[in-house]
UniProtKB/Swiss-Prot annotation:
In plastids the minimal PEP RNA polymerase catalytic core is composed of four subunits: alpha, beta, beta', and beta''. When a (nuclear-encoded) sigma factor is associated with the core the holoenzyme is formed, which can initiate transcription. It is found in: Plastid, Chloroplast. The lineage of its organism: Eukaryota, Discoba, Euglenozoa, Euglenida, Spirocuta. This is DNA-directed RNA polymerase subunit beta. GO terms for molecular function: DNA binding; DNA-directed RNA polymerase activity; ribonucleoside binding. One of its GO terms (biological process) is DNA-templated transcription.
Length: 1082
């Protein structure tokens, strides 16, 4: 229980606490398992209790800029002895380098921001299920690490055991005998006639046969197996704590499931009694006496964050290290000539460091940070993925796993998930969820006692396993102002034992702390979400993460209260770590003078202001009172403009001024997607729901020229160009501004060293770095050119800007590592909105811009204000996202009343139709205050007669209009549209390559052929399939025919058809091509 009436959501505590726990406990626990490594008198001892960590030598910003890894060093003292004589005594060695988590939960790896996605997997323990297809009953025993065991009972009530994914099964009795179960215990617990008969039959063969049978499952081709090796293999497989561990959670769940009292609390390996208890439980399930487990309940799943994932990876790495050290000890023992023992040759930190780097590079849970905006960054850090080590297989996921479970309430958002093949698998954590020390999700609740909400008793965090014993109610049940539940005799909606039902207030034990605690961050930003279909809210949540940062930022008129929470935890903002006075503020840094007063009293509130503190001190008696003032300066360095992982321009801007007093936790610098503590993802624009000349058919959108020319939806993007400098005449390459055959326009912005100037405006094919390569080969052609011109043959290999890029150079950096130097150039590009760009609202209403209309031709309001955007009204009834109508109308009243609103979801606690009445009330208030009667007409509320801008005539019917918060998404037409005149061809089919990255061409596919056939254009179709495609002979002659004005040759056989014939011949089908004269065609 947490003291206090309100819970403060710490959105990134899961990652921070997990990584901190790994450094304090997890790493030491794994090191203790290889504390001593010995062989023939040699002994290596790691003093695991004295592990030391050293801070990184470079800053996080330096690592980002130079493409390095921001990591800490792990140092461990080592002792090496030989026959009790010290060769090395208590010497610290560099054990490994581990990437260090930043304050915002990210890792800087090779100059890129990465995160480790939280993994949600089945908790260690035993689970009993029923196969829905063949009605077979099976149990699965899952350890923390080690082999999985599957127990299956067949129709004859015989139980068989499978190990991991091996298809071969062995009888349960044989497996129990291998584990060492006595005959007495077997008859005592499994007194079943079938098992007794099977046991008597197996006793005639002896116990050795069972060991050999088990060993053959793993090594079927091995012969001459010794009994000792087979027994040793089984014992190490399930009874060695270093290779098999149920874990604290797994042992507890096994004990509570199959034992009446908790046995083997300290022993976490597999015991024969565990297997015997599972078999007994299966027999009871076969008789129908006990229920099956619900696998998808959150009580059976736990969350593994970065700390647990790193610890499991270290377990594997340290086992490899132990084997490597043992091999080196054996080599040292067999080669006594090696008299001097060198620890540096014996142990190398790169052995572990390289494997950790591979873990961060290859693991599917390690991903590049989605930093398109503040919301996308935080949502990515709070994702839950079932994939990864010991997780689900993408190709074998069942529908049951994707469905919403009742235990997810308040723990996992039931709305926000991925769209497509990962729908229902990639989830997002709820706002106020907490993870306990074992990895189970907990949701906060208030205690309810005899119908009264006890808010003063604090908040209770309850897991899914604990919740089944209580009756919980949502926050939006009807209640009075005194926090008592209304009407003790009225039935209220509650949840009890995973079932939603109705109950009286006296039976309720807990109640939710807010109406939006079950939603994620993105879902909570959608106002009036209760009036939308869940699928559209899902789309709105996902598209907010895809919204671009605009040049002119604007906060929405309607907020939900999540904005401040997101900004506080986002990496885009900078928070003051203590109170003080700003003495310097610029784009590079902010300096705050921290002033602390120390006396014989203690100030508990660290957020005190300067004047309040002096006021308090004046009230205190000054007798025997000494006041000491401590002054420190804290410097906050702001990151220079840089490119995000998705090519978005990122910069931090200070919002405090010199002489201003700031308090602890206050935002002192804004990011590109924040404005004074508010999150800015789009713009408030005037929209009308109207069909206009068919241009907004099927979700197409019509916009005004004003949005283009006034840069309303203009965004800034960053391109990065990197090249290596080889300024060596011996190798025939150098950099220079004097480039052969280059026009003056393309090199006018170069400096004398051949590198472009900062602030230069570049266009298509401008030279960024001038590079010249001299041909050193003395070929006859080069000798002739030298004899004619007297100079060596030089080739232009300069770095040039792409054809579609127009921008400004923002930074030029020369990075040198040892003998290699590279140049990094950043170019900022300003993109206006254009036809083909994708826009969306917060309610899943998305569309593509189809036409840009002059402002004078757009429909206008009765007061002459032209509409900025025209949306299709038919997109609302079928999609059932009415929330956008509420938002647009309330935004309209917000503009005229000069008010801002905070809307909580599910606000109809006291009265029904609360949203509708509130919007109509504000519209009517705006009408009275502005004396504009068209703002609210009782006959058609929310609508007015608009006028056509082309002829100034009113439309036939009233039109709904208002201000909507519209987002510009990252799916821009400039990144997708592509065309080519010439380009590469495939060497096999002789057809153009596919894809924009390869400068490919557009293929004329099967459906396009059908379209041409439908019009009967036979000659056009023949030309498209031959000369314009892969008729190589006529394709090369087409240019000469066009120049000379002659007719094209007769079409030849295309290469694709020849390839088809060759493939048929490869299948031993004798097929050939002949001409009209029955001549074989090659």
């Amino acid at each position: 229980m947490v003291n206090g009436c309100r819970v403060r959501s710490n959105l990134l505590d899961i990652q921070r606490n997990s990584f901190r726990s790994f450094l304090k406990k997890g790493l030491v626990e794994e090191l203790r398992k290889i504390k001593d490594i010995a062989h023939e008198g040699f002994r290596i001892s790691f003093q695991t209790d004295n592990v030391k960590y050293k801070k990184p030598k470079i800053s996080a910003e330096f690592a980002l800029k130079n493409g390095e890894t921001y990591s800490l060093s792990v140092h461990i003292p080592v002792e090496v002895t030989y026959n009790n004589m010290f060769l090395v005594r208590n010497k610290y060695i560099l054990f490994a380098k581990i990437p260090l988590m930043t304050e915002k939960g990210t890792f800087i790896f090779n100059g890129n921001k990465r995160i480790m996605v939280n993994q949600i997997i089945r908790s260690p323990g035993v689970y009993f299920e029923k196969n829905r297809y063949n009605d077979s009953i099976f149990a699965t025993l899952i350890p923390t690490f080690g082999s999985w065991l599957t127990f299956k009972i067949d129709q004859d009530e015989g139980i068989f055991v499978k190990v991991d994914k091996i298809k071969t099964a062995i009888p349960l009795i044989n497996f129990l005998k291998c584990l060492g179960l006595s005959r007495k215990k077997f008859f005592l617990y499994l007194n079943d006639p079938i098992f007794i008969e099977t046991l008597q039959e197996s006793e005639s063969y002896g116990i050795r046969l069972e060991f050999f049978e088990f060993y053959k499952i793993f090594f079927p081709n091995e012969v001459n197996v010794r009994f000792g090796n087979a027994r040793k293999f089984l014992r190490s497989k399930f009874m060695d704590p270093r290779k098999y561990d149920l874990g604290e959670v797994g042992r507890f769940r096994v004990n509570t499931k199959i034992y009446r009292s908790e046995f083997f609390q300290s022993n976490r390996t597999l015991q024969p009694e565990d297997v015997l208890g599972i078999a007994h439980y299966l027999i009871e399930l076969k008789k129908g006496m006990i229920p099956f487990d619900e696998i998808d309940d959150l009580k059976n799943k736990l969350v593994r964050s970065i700390g647990e994932l790193l610890q499991s990876q270290f377990r594997i790495i340290l086992n490899e290290l132990e084997s490597s050290l043992k091999e080196k000890l054996i080599f040292l023992y067999k080669n006594p000539s090696e008299k001097t023992f060198r620890l540096s040759r014996f142990f190398n930190s790169y052995f572990i460091t390289n494997r950790i780097r591979k873990f961060f590079s290859v693991n599917p849970l390690s991903q590049l940070l989605d930093d398109t905006n503040s919301l996308s960054e935080l949502t990515h850090k709070r994702k839950l993925s079932p994939f990864g080590p010991n997780g689900l297989n993408k190709e074998r996921t069942k529908l049951d796993v994707r469905e919403i479970n009742t235990s997810q309430y308040g723990r996992v958002c039931p709305i926000e998930t991925s769209e497509g093949k990962n729908a229902g698998l990639i989830l997002s954590l709820a706002k106020d969820v907490r993870v306990d020390k074992y990895g189970f999700l907990e949701s906060p609740f208030y205690k309810v006692l005899r119908g009264k909400i006890e808010t003063n008793k604090g908040i209770y965090f309850i897991s899914s396993a604990q919740e089944k014993y209580f009756t919980v109610a949502p926050f939006d049940v009807f209640r009075s102002s005194q926090s008592n539940l209304l009407d003790k005799n009225k039935l209220l909606g509650v949840k009890r034992s995973k079932i939603f039902s109705y109950s009286f207030s006296k039976n309720i034990d807990f109640i939710s702390i807010s109406t939006d605690q079950f939603t994620s961050l993105g879902t909570g930003l959608v106002p009036f979400l209760e009036h939308n279909d869940a699928n559209r809210v899902l789309m709105g949540s996902n598209m907010q993460r895809q919204s671009l940062i605009l040049l002119e930022k604007e906060v929405p008129f309607i907020k939900t209260g999540r904005e401040a929470l997101i900004n506080r935890e986002s990496d885009a903002t900078v928070l003051a770590k203590s109170s003080g006075k700003v003495i310097y503020s610029s784009l590079k840094k902010i300096v705050i003078q921290e002033e602390e007063y120390c006396a014989n009293i203690e100030f508990f509130n660290k957020n005190y202001s300067f004047f309040n503190l002096l006021g308090c001190l004046n009230e205190i008696s000054q007798k025997n009172f000494k006041l000491i003032k401590k002054v420190n300066q804290k410097i906050y360095f702001l990151e220079s403009p840089k490119k995000s992982n998705h090519g978005v321009y990122i910069q931090k801007i200070p919002i405090v001024h010199e002489g201003e007093w700031v308090r602890k936790g206050q935002i002192i610098a804004d990011g590109m997607s924040t404005l004074r503590g508010g999150i800015c993802l789009g713009k408030n624009v005037l929209v009308a729901y109207l069909g206009w000349e068919g241009y907004n058919f099927e979700d197409a959108v019509i916009i005004s020229e004003r949005l283009v020319f006034e840069d309303i939806f203009t965004s800034i993007h960053m391109k990065k160009f990197k090249t290596f400098i080889v300024n060596d005449e011996k190798k025939g390459e150098n950099i220079s501004m004097f480039i052969p055959n280059a026009s003056l326009k393309t090199i006018k912005n170069l400096k004398n060293n051949g590198i472009i100037k900062i602030g230069s405006e570049i266009k298509a094919q401008d030279v960024l770095i001038g590079r010249i390569k001299v041909k050193l080969k003395n070929t006859p052609k080069n000798k002739m050119l030298i004899a004619f011109f007297g100079n060596k043959v030089r080739k232009d290999v300069s770095l040039r800007s792409p054809r579609s890029l127009v921008g400004i150079v923002t930074s030029v950096e020369i990075l040198c590592k040892k003998s290699n130097c590279s140049v990094l150039i950043h170019v900022a590009e300003k993109r206006r909105i254009q036809i083909g760009d994708k826009i969306a609202g917060r309610h899943g209403n998305k569309g593509i811009i189809s036409k840009i209309v002059p402002s004078i031709d757009m429909p206008f309001l009765p007061d002459g204000t032209p509409v900025d955007m025209i949306l299709n009204p038919l997109g609302i009834p079928s999609r059932m996202n009415v929330g956008q109508v509420f938002e647009s109308l309330l935004n309209l009243s917000s503009l005229f009343l000069k008010e801002r609103y905070k809307i909580q979801p599910f606000d109809e606690v006291q009265t029904s139709m609360n949203s509708k009445s509130f919007v109509y009330k504000k519209l009517n208030e705006a009408r009275k205050r502005t004396k504009k009667d068209w703002l609210f007409n009782p006959n058609y509320p929310g609508k007015a007669f608009l006028y056509d801008g082309r002829n100034c005539r009113p439309f036939d019917h009233p039109v709904a209009f208002g201000y909507a918060y519209i987002l510009k998404l990252i799916h821009m037409v400039k990144d997708k549209i592509h065309a080519r005149v010439t380009g590469p061809y495939s060497s096999v089919t002789q057809q153009p390559l596919r894809g924009k990255s390869k400068n490919g061409g557009q293929r004329f596919g099967e459906m396009e052929v059908w379209a041409i056939e439908g019009f009967g254009a036979a000659y056009l179709l023949q030309e498209l399939l031959t000369i314009k495609s892969d008729d190589v002979l006529n394709r090369s002659e087409a240019l000469f025919s066009l120049i000379n004005g002659t007719y094209f040759s007769k079409p030849n056989i295309p290469e694709a058809f020849k390839l088809f014939i060759l493939e048929m011949q490869s299948l031993c089908i004798d097929i050939k091509i002949f001409t009209n004269n029955y001549k074989k065609f090659d």
